[in-house]
From Swiss-Prot:
Gene3D superfamilies: 3.30.160.810, Translation factors
Taxonomic source organism: Roseobacter denitrificans (strain ATCC 33942 / OCh 114) (Erythrobacter sp. (strain OCh 114))
Protein name per Swiss-Prot or TrEMBL: Large ribosomal subunit protein uL3
Entry keyword Protein transport: no
Disordered: annotated segments: 246-286
Record PTM N5-methylglutamine, positions in chain: 152
GO annotation, biological process: translation
Length: 286
């Protein structure tokens, strides 16, 4: 089951305290006006996917082609755009906004982003090499990686040999991070542990591929329009219930008033009969 992921901005790290007193380090991810920009269908494009856009970009900083692309979708220019493969039945309408309730507490997700660049790094920093000895004939090369191969045969350095070189600034995916808490009102997703990238960087969040698909996942996505409709329905139901309660209270009050009036009428009738009997008795005595 494939459904859309989300584009989020890395706000930073903090900690959350649980009810049992334990503290969990979390990374705060924010969904900033995450909307569907385009659809990819099997009939037209050969595959099924949704294209999402997040953030807000200035129109003058957006190319003319992308301005037309966003105008066709009737959305504001977006800062970040990404595609997510989905099943055909999980396509989302263009212009729909996805909320943080797309994921739930306890769910496992995969977060991908661009790692922090370290520049040109040595083998000890880049590959955790131990380095050479501090003495016993070693000079200058204490932090070098040592030999890079064999002799005349094969007479070359094999591809993939761990050596010094550029470190970081690469696409990295951290798998099986657990969602600790979500805040739909502020668009926040808090995941346990660290995610690639620096503060303010963009990351993509997907359902974990190495975990079973959650049964209570919202399909095709947690949409803001659906939440608003549910809220309106709840308000209408609450208003109807309040109206019914008010009508029932009014009916009960009317019944009570009628009962009181009937009791007063019966009491008045009893008094009238008693007065008549007393008058007759008085006349008989006279």
């Amino acid at each position: 089951m494939l459904r859309s992921g989300v584009i989020a901005k890395k706000v930073g790290m903090t900690r959350l305290f649980m009810e049992d007193g334990k503290q969990i380090p979390v990374t705060v991810l924010q969904l900033d006006k995450l909307q569907v920009v385009a659809q990819r269908t099997s009939e037209k494009d050969g595959y099924s996917a949704v294209q999402l856009g997040a953030g807000t970009a200035k129109a003058k900083r957006t190319s003319q082609a992308m301005r037309g692309h966003f105008a066709a979708a009737k959305v504001e220019p977006k800062r970040k755009v990404a595609e997510f493969r989905v099943d055909p039945e999980n396509l989302i309408g263009v212009g729909e906004e996805i909320t943080a309730n797309h994921y739930f507490e306890g769910q496992f997700v995969d977060v991908a982003g661009t790692s922090i660049g370290k520049g040109f790094a040595g083998a000890m920093k880049r590959h955790n090499f131990g380095g050479l000895r501090a003495s016993h004939g070693v000079s200058i090369s204490h932090r070098s990686h040592g030999s890079t191969g064999q002799c005349q045969d094969p007479g070359k350095v094999f591809k993939g040999k761990k050596m010094a070189g550029h470190m970081g600034a690469a696409r990295v995916t951290t798998q099986n991070l657990q969602v600790v808490r979500t805040d739909a009102n502020r668009g926040l997703i808090m995941v346990k542990g660290a995610v690639p990238g620096s503060k303010g960087g963009w990351v993509t969040v997907k359902d974990a591929v190495k975990k079973p698909f959650p049964e209570n996942a919202i399909l095709p996505a947690a949409l803001k329009s659906a939440a608003e409709e549910a809220e309106k329905a709840a308000e209408a139901a609450a208003a109807a219930a309040a109206a019914e309660a008010e009508a029932a209270a009014a009916a009960a009050a009317a019944e009570e008033q009628a009962a009181m009036e009937a009791a007063e009428a019966a009491e008045a009738k009893t008094d009238t009969v008693a007065e008549a009997e007393a008058a007759e008795k008085k006349e008989g005595d006279a």
